[in-house]
Amino acid sequence: MVVVTEEIVNGLKETLTDVSQPIAKRFRSLFTLRNLNGPLCIDAMASALNDKSALLRHEIAYCLGQMEDEYALKVLIDLVKNSDEHPMVRHEAAEALGAIGSESAHKTLKEYSNDPVREVSETCQLALSRVEWYEKNKPETEEDKMYMSVDPAPPLKKGSVSRDELRSKFLDSNLDIFNRYRALFSLRDIGDEQSVLALCDGLKDQSSALLRHEVAFVLGQLQHRVAIDPLTTCVLDESENAMVRHEAAEALGAIASTETIPLLEKLLQDKEPIVSESCAVALDVTEYFNNTESFQYADGIKILLEKNLVDQQQK
């Protein structure tokens, strides 16, 4: 067990905020701070929210939500309210407020559920529905959960709906976003090839970029090779929302098939920074999953110790 000290947090913060470092290395420090948890780590993460990388800022917001700590509420509320911020970052901050589930975020979520930016308004609606659902229902136990992520909507009760019915609900553009998400996560939890193919159909859904981006994220969690071609088509589509292409790129990295490496390397030159940076992170993840010597992806402390050793040797 790692004792969280100011020295460790400051070292990770230094890497996180160092614009000269590769984006993938900065992400590793971010994930390490998320895993260590606590106010010191939240402050360190928040200190990088003025970075020019929208991808990094959005990932910080995501991590703050996954920590489920009310200490991060003010930072997240400010992000949602900032109309000059990138929509992807505002969306992630709103989703994080839903993940934390505090009543003090209700006012902001309700106010911005009519935001002119659709990704923001839909996420606020989704987050409100999540908070209201958990006010009336017991959360899943850790034993019941198949994935450790704090999801923006709970799956439906296991066995209560057939796979075909779930697919129908998931693809029904007339259904509200919360219930479509519930069907999405139910398909994820089934996790067989037919469910993965049903999810891949969602990448072609034109009713919601928010839904498509969540599909890509979930396909990364599932790591099923049958999703490689649909994800490849998605990330290559320059007309697609950058938020969706980003998730598709990182999903390909999570699947960690060496056949996707040339594609990801090519897209390092993509004109959309969110996509090119996502491909750099995806390649780092692919390398990790294909390197049996690696133990933990969020290895910021290991990197920090190695840096300190080098510094000492140079003195």
Curated annotation (Swiss-Prot):
Fe cation 1 binds at H58, H246, E247. HEAT-like PBS-type repeats lie at residues 23-52, 56-82, 89-115, 179-205, 211-237, 244-270. Binds 2 Fe(2+) ions per subunit. GO terms for biological process: peptidyl-lysine modification to peptidyl-hypusine. Fe cation 2 binds at H91, E92, H213. InterPro entries: ARM-like (IPR011989), ARM-type_fold (IPR016024), Deoxyhypusine_hydroxylase (IPR027517), PBS_lyase_HEAT (IPR004155). Pathway: Protein modification; eIF5A hypusination. One of its GO terms (molecular function) is deoxyhypusine monooxygenase activity. Its cofactor is Fe(2+). Catalyzes the hydroxylation of the N(6)-(4-aminobutyl)-L-lysine intermediate produced by deoxyhypusine synthase/DHPS on a critical lysine of the eukaryotic translation initiation factor 5A/eIF-5A. This is the second step of the post-translational modification of that lysine into an unusual amino acid residue named hypusine. Hypusination is unique to mature eIF-5A factor and is essential for its function. Belongs to the deoxyhypusine hydroxylase family. This is Deoxyhypusine hydroxylase. It comes from Dictyostelium discoideum.
